[in-house]
Design a protein with these regions (language model features):
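Short, conserved DNA-binding cores of transcription-related domains
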Residues: 1-87, 92-93
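Short, positively charged, Gly/Tyr-enriched micro-motifs
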Residues: 60-153
Length: 153
């Protein structure tokens, strides 16, 4: 069943476990984490030690039926056990970029929505649960629109 949910959410990561699913009003909340496996340091090949977990709340607007989908992702922090190396890194998910609060598919869905010239950035922002400034930045990041020259007097 977990594989079906992962395919439905357009998440292609085989190491992810769905630990819990909640529905609270018009918000669906899915708790995700990676399977625990032995990690080795990419720098010195020593065994890594888990230094704890932290939680990220990710907006994943794949549902367009009036529900808001939140992914609660639990990531582990890893530290190298070699005292000369001491490398730190975190679990990585291929559908979330570093430091982002929305999934990687969100900008493409926003750009697809912005094709309609009758929709404002505020309307798109409300639909995807982000700020209108973020919609504007996404639009400018992916589209290179040249300015028209000023008219001569």
């Amino acid at each position: 069943m977990n594989n079906d949910i992962m395919k439905f959410l357009n998440i292609e990561d085989k190491d992810i476990i769905i630990s819990k699913i909640l529905i609270d009003g018009n918000t669906k909340i899915i708790y995700l984490e990676k399977t625990l496996k032995v990690e080795y340091c990419p720098a010195c090949s020593s065994r890594m030690h888990s230094k704890g977990k932290y939680i990220r709340k990710i907006n994943h607007p794949i549902l367009q039926d009036g529900y808001q989908l939140k992914l609660i992702v639990t990531q582990r922090k890893w530290r190298c056990t070699n005292p000369q190396c001491n490398l730190y890194f975190n679990d990585q998910f291929n559908f979330i970029s570093k430091y982002k609060q929305s999934s990687n598919i969100t900008p493409y869905m926003i750009l697809n929505e912005m094709k309609n010239i009758h929709i404002t950035t505020a309307g798109v922002a409300r639909k995807y649960n982000i700020s209108d400034t973020s919609v504007h930045y996404i639009f400018l990041q992916y589209l290179n629109i040249k300015r028209l020259p000023l008219p001569e007097i």
